Every structure is written in structure tokens, then in C-alpha cells.
């Protein structure tokens, strides 16, 4: 007798460095709790981010910029991801890194503009007329073929639809008959037909026929309520970049050039300003008609000091345009030379005229107690058991070195504990692992001591 275990089909997600962040962890009045939603400490920065989230939701923040500034390992990226979690899936959030703009195929400013457009959403409301019901009759009407010969062509289709409220007989175009055949529609099926496009969708078999057969692979659906002819409101969320790409590369042309273009490897081409201007006009027309509404999202630029002076100059114009998202910069630099210049130093590697336009949120270094809490949260996320002694020791290591280094020691220490036959990480496992792997500071110290032994 063979017994098989049923494996779960739910997707297992890889645990990333910020998997534990679920939100900003604020209470109803907007004040930060000491530890909530995966974030610990940084109360002032979290409250400031909470204010920004409220401004974004009320659509009063578009075209502004925020800078998250602080030393490495103080949770700048985590704060940006927490903002994305708070806003939800309906608001577009586009993360990018400063070094992404450098490409051999397209200009730096084009990459920036693409990401700007990705961060602006458009919610389109569409009212569709739909005929929905159970098929009571399906009769194709034939006529003599006008081209001559013995064949006959279908002139129209008579279809009867029934709902709980009543029945209707429709006379449909012969092109819809092909769709009905593709969907394998027969009497007793529940279908809906879109009046504008003529699209046919078979939803399933009506549940009054459920007892006909013992074995049936059909999906049974109830008889639709209401009238046969209905009006449905459908809401679609797209970004402006989706519209740009759809119009820059139209698909499905019948001429030889289109065919060749589809076969050849598509080269990344720039989308012209003229095309974007045309799309903006159409979008503005939709907004004026009340068909669509603009949803300004968030563009998150990590390592913003990697951008050069041309990109910063372009950002000035982009931030002041009529359609602009909220831009969040993050930088861990102090005073440094602006990329693309010889000797102009500036705070965070950002020119002073752009710094003047951004609201700056500072992130502070974590205290040893906060570090311990973060390591504990990480251990829970990764499903690792850790003793109190080992946790204290990791907290001390984090204070001396960096938080990232102490978090990275968790998994190897867990592996060592398993080899030793222990369920949880003890202090001696952490000590052994920290001797095996160096942190950045101790590695740099060894380099300084043994400088003459290394190649220049």
C-alpha cells in the first residue's frame, strides 16, 4: 500500500534582509511605538515618515522630495520599504539604486524619467455594458454564400439568455459565433457577452444541471441575478510608463517591417519627449472627463550620491513638472565630492540647490538594547532559536562592529548549533563563528598591520 504525503503548494518566499518589515509601527495618533511592525527605535524618523504617508494619501505631497540621511546600517532602506507597506499595493512604489542610471544604450536622464513615470499611477474607471445569463437557445441562421458555390455562410446568431429576473433573445454578429464555438458554449451554460467589444466569456455550467452526471469536470455556477442587460464598472490600475511602452512599440502590425521587428531582438530604445507629451495630453483629457484619476506614487532612489551633476540638474526640472511623484532619496555619505565634478564638496553628495528643495529625515545609530531587539526579530523571521546569552553576545558584537555583521552571524551560528546537536544557538557557537569570520573593521586593521605583505 503506497502512502504519499501531500506537499503544500503555497509559494515559499526567500527571506530577504528586510522581510520582517511590515509597516511603520505607529499608533492611531501617529506616534511611534518602541517596537512594532518589525521596526525598532528610530521614533522621530518613523513619525516623520508617518506624516509623509498621510500627505501622500491625501495627494498633497506630489513633486516634493524627502532625504533619509544617516550612517550605514541605521534602517534607511527599511523605512522606505515600510512607507511602501503603509501605502498598500494600489499606490505605485518604484525602488531604484543611484548606479542604475548608467547605461550604454540609453541616456542617464532617460532612465530617470522612465522610473519617474513608473512611479505615477493612473486609475481608469470604465463602464461596460454586459449581457449575462444562462443560454436557453443557440441558433445560427445561414444564408446562401454571396461568392457563389454550394457552401452557406452564417448571417447571424440567435441566442436566448435567461436570468432570475427574465429572459432576452439577442441577434448577434457572425464573428461572435466563432467566439462562442471557441468557448464551446452550449445550452445550459452561463456566459457573458461584452456589448462594446463582443468578447464572450463562459463562466461555467448552470447549477440546475448539477445532478445530471455522477462524474463531471464542470464548474457549476448559480443562475445570474438581476437583468440580462447590465452595466458593470471596471477599475484598472496602470502606470504612465506602461502607457509609454505600449505606444512606443505597437504590436501586431501586418506589414513586413512589423513582422521583422517582432522576430529581431528588441533593442532598448528611448521614448521620445514628444510621445510622452502626447500621452500626457490624453491622460489630462481623461482626468478632465472624470474617466481616470491620477495616483502619484513613490520613487525611492537609494545611494543617491552615486548620481552625477547632470542627473541632479535634471531632477530639478523633473520634480517641478506638473506630473511628478513623491521622491525619497537615501544616502549614507557625509561631506563628499559630487560625482561628475572635480572639487565641489557638498553634504550627502547632493548639490546645495537640490538639498534646499528636500525635507531631510535623520536616522540615528541604534543603542545596544535596540540592536538586541532587531537581532531577535531577525532570528524569529528566519525561524532560528537563540538563547538569551547568545543574544546578549550578538548585541555586544553589533555595538562594537555593525548591526549587519551581527545579523549575518545568525545563520552560520545556527548551522554550527545543529552540527553540535543543539536546538538553539548558544554563546559558544557565536564566539566560534565570530572568530572564523572577520568584520570590516578588524579586516581593515589586519590590512593596516600587514600592509607591506600585500600587493600595491
From Swiss-Prot:
It comes from the Eukaryota. There is a cross-link at residues 2, 225, 445 (Glycyl lysine isopeptide (Lys-Gly) (interchain with G-Cter in SUMO2)). The keyword Magnesium does not apply. There is a cross-link at residue 225 (Glycyl lysine isopeptide (Lys-Gly) (interchain with G-Cter in SUMO1)). Forms homohexameric rings. Can form a dodecamer with RUVBL2 made of two stacked hexameric rings; however, even though RUVBL1 and RUVBL2 are present in equimolar ratio, the oligomeric status of each hexamer is not known. Oligomerization may regulate binding to nucleic acids and conversely, binding to nucleic acids may affect the dodecameric assembly. Interaction of the complex with DHX34 results in conformational changes of the N-terminus of the RUVBL2 subunits, resulting in loss of nucleotide binding ability and ATP hydrolysis of the complex. This is RuvB-like 1. Its main location: nucleus. Keywords: Acetylation, Activator, ATP-binding, Cell cycle, Cell division, Chromatin regulator, Cytoplasm, Cytoskeleton, DNA damage, DNA recombination, DNA repair, Growth regulation, Helicase, Hydrolase, Isopeptide bond, Membrane, Mitosis, Nucleotide-binding, Nucleus, Transcription, Transcription regulation, Ubl conjugation. The modification N6-acetyllysine is found at residue 453. The gene is Ruvbl1. ATP binds at residues 70-77. Its EC number is 3.6.4.12.
